[in-house]
Amino acid sequence: MARYTGPVTRKSRRLGTDLVGGDQSFEKRPYPPGQHGRARIKDSEYRQQLQEKQKARFTYGVMEKQFRRYYEEAVRHSGKTGEELLKILESRLDNVVYRAGLARTRRMARQLVSHGHFSVNGVHVNVPSYRVSQYDIIDVRDNSLNTVPFQIARETAGDRPIPSWLQVVGERQRILIHQLPERAQIEVPLTEQLIVEYYSK
């Protein structure tokens, strides 16, 4: 599947938000790249909606076609469409690995999943977009536990708060999904209603 692999800091500056988390280069220059980056650009309603959609896509590392499918699924749910969309994005396995503190960024989490380091409910899973469910159990595979990424994760455990809807247990770094997150539990700088308005046109 196609994936954006370009400079993430440049994309962060274009969209006005840190897509990585702790990106020092973005913090130094949080304005769009290029010679006119500091110039004020009048935001139209459409531009704001498009930018919010792009922020969500690049935050979670999802291509447009798949993101549109997530939106269409969210529309079919009984809750608020924007909130349901965020719940879907948060339930991706790569995001769960990131939220649990086993990877510094979502991009790194995606690589760890793709390289086959995890099982879900005892079944080997290497698809970053795999969707977890309530009561799922995610384990680091035995032959991966002592590799560098997971050693670092153990050493830095507690550096980043873990959301209350999941739990990391013991030295084996088992992840327990207590529930799927509610909107108040999702800390991400997005205004999801703008995304709904973008696709509702």
UniProtKB/Swiss-Prot annotation:
Cysteine pairings via disulfide bonds: none
Keywords noted in UniProt: Ribonucleoprotein, Ribosomal protein, RNA-binding, rRNA-binding
S4 RNA-binding domain mapped to chain residues: 91-157
PROSITE patterns, alphabetized: RIBOSOMAL_S4, S4
GO cellular component, one term: small ribosomal subunit
SMART domains documented for this protein: Ribosomal_S4 (SM01390), S4 (SM00363)
Example of a GO MF term: structural constituent of ribosome
Entry-linked Pfam families: Ribosomal_S4 (PF00163), S4 (PF01479)
GO terms, biological process: ribosomal small subunit biogenesis; translation
Signal peptide region: none
Annotated stretches, region: Disordered: 1-42
InterPro entries cross-referenced by the UniProt entry: Ribosomal_uS4, Ribosomal_uS4_bac-type, Ribosomal_uS4_CS, Ribosomal_uS4_N, S4_RNA-bd, S4_RNA-bd_sf
HAMAP family, per database record: Ribosomal_uS4_B (MF_01306_B)
NCBIfam families the UniProt entry points to: PRK05327.1 (NF003717), rpsD_bact (TIGR01017)
PANTHER family named among the record's database cross-references: 30S 40S RIBOSOMAL PROTEIN (PTHR11831), SMALL RIBOSOMAL SUBUNIT PROTEIN US4M (PTHR11831:SF4)
Subunit: Part of the 30S ribosomal subunit. Contacts protein S5. The interaction surface between S4 and S5 is involved in control of translational fidelity.
Family the UniProt entry places it in: Belongs to the universal ribosomal protein uS4 family.
Function: One of the primary rRNA binding proteins, it binds directly to 16S rRNA where it nucleates assembly of the body of the 30S subunit.
Protein name as catalogued: Small ribosomal subunit protein uS4
Annotated source species: Mycobacterium marinum (strain ATCC BAA-535 / M)
